[in-house]
């Protein structure tokens, strides 16, 4: 029987930024993409989400809600490269791994359209025949979870 692990990292883009810039971890920040001259939120960290901001929101609306919001440019290509490296790192668990990124796009409509998956990413690991090497599926998942959050 085929067994596949799907890891969804909903805040991959902002978590990656928070690791690179620790001073931002507890402050609300958003990553912005521009489309047709209109900046919009591509990804928001948990502090910004608690303040009511969501991916897809127009930057002007986000600033009206949270004037102190820290804005950074979105780097989806960099996120994709790091996610691919992370998929390679998952080779410790199985020879069959792949990254699956969710790329959001700033919509043309205003003022707010949710971008499901924007700034997030995921990993698929074919664990068929591999879990026993880690003490079973549960132990394997615990190991993956603890290591990936470091």
State where each predicted segment sits:
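Residues that scaffold, gate, or flank divalent-cation-dependent active/transport sites
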Residues: 1-131, 136-146
């Amino acid at each position: 029987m085929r067994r596949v692990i799907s890891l969804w990292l909903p805040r991959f883009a902002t978590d990656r930024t928070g690791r690179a810039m620790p001073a931002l971890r507890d402050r609300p920040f958003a990553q912005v993409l521009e489309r047709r001259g209109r900046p919009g939120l591509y990804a928001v960290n948990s502090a910004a989400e608690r303040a009511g901001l969501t991916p897809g929101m127009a930057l002007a609306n986000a600033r009206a809600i949270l004037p102190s919001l820290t804005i950074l440019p979105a780097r989806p290509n960099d996120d994709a490269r790091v996610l691919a490296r992370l998929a390679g790192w998952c080779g410790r668990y199985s020879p069959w791994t792949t990254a699956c990124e969710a790329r959001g796009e700033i919509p043309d409509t205003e003022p707010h359209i949710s971008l499901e998956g924007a700034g997030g990413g995921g990993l698929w690991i074919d664990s068929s025949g591999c879990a026993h090497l880690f003490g079973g599926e549960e132990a394997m998942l615990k190991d993956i979870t603890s290591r990936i959050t470091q």
